[in-house]
Amino acid sequence: MPDFDLTVIGSGPGGYVAAIHAARMGARVAILEQDAAGWGGTCLNWGCIPTKSLIQGAEVLQAVRRAGEFGVRVAEPEVDWPAMRGRKDRVVGGMRRGVQGLLEANGVEMVTARGRLAGGTRVSADGRELHGRGVLLAPGSVVALPPVPGVELALTSDTILGVERVPGSLVVIGGGVVGMEFASLFNLLGSRVTVVEMLDQVLAPLDPEVAGAFLRLLARRGVEVHLGARVEEIAVEGGLRRVRFSGGELRAEQVLVATGRRPNTGDLGLEAAGVATDGPAIAVDGHLRTSAEAVYAIGDATAVSMLAHTASYQGEVAVANALGEKRISADYTAIPACVYTEPEIAFVGLSEAQARAAGEEVRVGRFPFSALGRALVLGETDGLVKVVADADGYLLGVTIMGPRATDLIAEAALGLGVGITAAELSHVVHAHPTLPEALAEAALDVAGRAVHVAPRRRR
């Protein structure tokens, strides 16, 4: 008789959420985590949570610096980097213990060991063998380093969290989400920041219009960005790091390589277990099933969408399919993406360019935060909301750059997920004065009816 109904490999936001859902369905569940200090996965320990804790500290610093604008006199604030790191560690530690407590409270057996498929639905765990009715693979991802000479001289998104002081200058290689978040963070903390990106825009696949506006804001804040630039070498010269790229050379105290992540699928025993892969990723169908009987996979290891909330959603779907009577398919239409820069950026669904490329007849509405009462009160007027709808007015996508964009995107995701029109969104009464009013105004603007901007010129 199997020891468990479900054995989960990996305790990140996919694995631990799936384990809890399974336990609450009455299943006997075991979950494996290879690192005793890694419960909660990369997101909690080295990614989402620690970085946002540091970013929050930088935002407080910025708010204090601007206190005079609001009639408040304060002394010039100073960055206490060790204290910021200490707070970050306390937040992470508390949340890690919270995850362990939730698993324990739900009767999930926690095993600190590297899990490996041992044939069928058996999993080996450092000398112990666990036999389950099903297996859920949630091993996450690891930092992907480019094949650049001297790359070992650079920091990664993992190691930069442990630097002893804020660098006076920083070169960030990679203009994706991770790279731009760290660029924004250290710019706020006083570093001279330069970004080198191989593509012709940062934050792809962000709406190009918004990406361009974001670049202009970065330039205003002193961040230098080189687009279409390929890094050729990293070296040490005169006590500094030297970065040679296709457009020239840069020197800085530190270099951060933020060129992406890859599925953490090594040494899982996939091939021997008959689990097919798509490159480095585990291949899954719409039900999150792998090619092996009763083996499912979720999260970054599937490379469907390397987002923590996608992994959690996939975990819920996979558990329902593994243990339930009805099959359900994963739907990624309304998965939002968030970027914790200054200002914040968030998007869900299709950008205008993606919608047009898909052959849609597109209608677009925009509304700037500079015309919004709440944004003016907050003194945060950079950015806009952009709504993309089809010819019948149904939402195709929303992009937001501005204050609390990462919170505001939830309403847009809900609207896109349930399939409403821009007009229906605009008819929802939004409290005044609030930031979500910008979304309602942008939805009104799809039909040229936004109230708090000048009317469009008639042709």
Task: Identify the function of each model-found stretch.
Residues M1-G12, V166-G176:
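Beta1/beta-strand and adjacent pyrophosphate-binding region of the FAD-binding site
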Residues P2-F4, I20-A27, E33-V166, T194, ...:
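Glycine-rich flavin
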Residues T7-I9, G115, L130-G140, V172-I173, ...:
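Short hydrophobic core segments
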Residues I9-A18, A23-A37, T42, I49, ...:
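Flexible, glycine-rich terminal cap/loop adjacent to redox cofactors
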Residues G15, G179-M180:
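N-terminal Rossmann-fold NAD(P) dinucleotide-binding loop
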Residues A19, A23, A183, N187-L188:
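Gly/Ala-rich phosphate-binding loop of Rossmann-like dinucleotide-binding domains
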Residues T112, V284-G286, A389-D390:
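Short, acidic, Ser/Thr-enriched surface-loop or helix-capping motifs
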Residues V151-P167, E249-K326, G415:
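FAD-site-proximal beta/loop scaffold in flavoenzymes
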